[in-house]
Amino acid sequence: MALGGLGEFGLNALVLEWQAECLLVDAGMGFGNSELPGVDSVVPDFEYLEERGRSVRAIVLTHGHEDHIGALAFALEAAPHTPVYGSRLTLGFVRRRLRERGIDADLRLLTPGQPVEAGVFRVHPIRVAHSVIDSLALAIETPVGVVMMSGDFKMSHGPAADEQTDVEASAPGATAACSPSSPTAPTSRSRAGRGRKTT
């Protein structure tokens, strides 16, 4: 269930739920626009998490952009003591932001190729290229199938040579795939069989 992020830029927050257990993927903020004059930022309504209390097994972050981590403090207020998983850089951003708000959180490192258990969910982090390094897609095993959550990504080379999307580590047999899409100006073009050409 999406708490935000559908049909809009930002507010990325999606809940996977099985019986009495749930997992939150991303906790992003939205930004003011011409339809919201005077508003700088917007956060998802985390009342759904608050109602579930300790059944929230984990918050898993795909990358360190504000539209994916900016509302984490509010998610943790709704579901205190929930472990937060993310890549090293993402957790660095999160740690600083939470410290500014006086929030002590259980932050846990996600490493591509090393799955983690969160209740009935098994999360497989997969490296993806994006405009911020250390970005992840997630293959999430549930009791009824595998859900592929891409986070933001691009299918061209990332800012660092080793930050390419690991297409070999995708989720074969995934039951569902969820992927945000936002229009972006291309920074390079990739052609099958021809390598990379910068524009």
Where are these regions (language model features)?
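His/Asp/Glu-rich metal-coordinating catalytic cores
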Residues: 1-60, 65-199
